[in-house]
Amino acid sequence: MSNALDVKAITKKFFAAYDAHDVEGMLALCADGAQGRYLPYGKNSAMPIRGGLEKIWRGFPQAVPDFGVEIVELIEGEDNAVTVQALLGGTMPADVPGVVNKGEIDRIAHAYIIRYNADGKITRLDCYWDNTAITAIKASAL
């Protein structure tokens, strides 16, 4: 791993932009042609970040206006890769049976694997989460 590349700092900047609902700031940290995959959408759900995952990033703050992001743990790996445990959420717009009631504030655990190129730009972002809660939020936004 390059000593000059601080992937932890770049990752913190990415999640700070997400917390601030600054999708343009998030995209600025992604390489051209960067790919992402949100695994609960299926193992073959890889898509471009620009025009793909970007839509999801823009959508959650609309469904959950006080949407926020908190990094719980950040682990630097090999080859400019980072694993992140984060809590994402806010005031729930719908009941999530057994998890949270409509109007309550909750954050849903997410796990990210983020890979960077030598220039410090995200080239790949994979994410895992509890899909039951997310499905309820998506349904409420329709």
Language model: regions and residue ranges:
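C-terminal and inter-domain tail/linker signature
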Residues: 1-142
